[in-house]
Amino acid sequence: MTTSVDASIRVAETGDLAFLAESHRLGHSAIANARGGDLDIALRGRPEPIEESFAASLDEEHTHVLIGEVAGVPVGYLVGTVELLRTGDHIFRVSDLWVHPNARGIGTGGELMRKAMDIARGAGCIGIDARALPGDRVTKNFFESFGLVARTIEVHKSL
C-alpha cells in the first residue's frame, strides 16, 4: 500500500551526478541476480564512468533526467527520452527508474511517473514505454497502475 508524502520532482543538474551514479549502481546490484538482470545490465546499463554517462544525458536535448525528493533529500530518479518513430510519431521511453528501498511505497516513484507522463504529453508523444524484468511483479504492477501494458516479450537462450 502506498502512503503519500510530499514528494517533489525536479530536473536533475550537475550537482546530482554523484547521487545518480550511486543510485544507478544500487539499482543494478539489486537486479544483477534476478532472472534476466545480468543481460539487461550488459545490454542497457550505463558505461563507466557512470557520472559522465549521466552528464551526457543532462546535455541531450530530448532526454529528461528527473530527481524525486522527500523533504529536500534525493531518494529516486527517472530518465526518459522522447524518441522519433519511423511513422513520424514520438514515444517517451523510460530507460531508468529507481527509488531508494527505504523511500518506496510513499509515492515518490508515482510522482516521477506522473511527471514523465506530463513531459510525454507535452512533447506530443503517442505513448510511454518502460521495462520490467521477468518475474518482477512489483515493477510490472507499478507500471500497470499507470496504464502501461505489455506489448512485447523478449526471449533469450544462453549459448
Q: Where in the sequence are the language-model features?
A:
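Acetyl-CoA-dependent GNAT
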Residues: 3, 7, 11-15, 22-34, ...
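Amphipathic alpha-helical recognition patches that constitute DNA-binding helices
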Residues: 19, 93, 138
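Residues that form or flank phosphate/diphosphate-binding pockets in enzymes
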Residues: 89, 107, 138
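Conserved acetyl-CoA-binding loop-helix of GNAT-fold acetyltransferases
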Residues: 96-99, 105-118, 141, 145
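Conserved beta-strand-loop-alpha-helix junction that forms the acyl-donor binding cleft
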Residues: 104, 129-139, 156-159
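Conserved active-site alpha-helix within GNAT-family acetyltransferase domains
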Residues: 110, 122, 134-152
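Conserved GNAT acetyl-CoA-binding A-motif
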Residues: 120-131
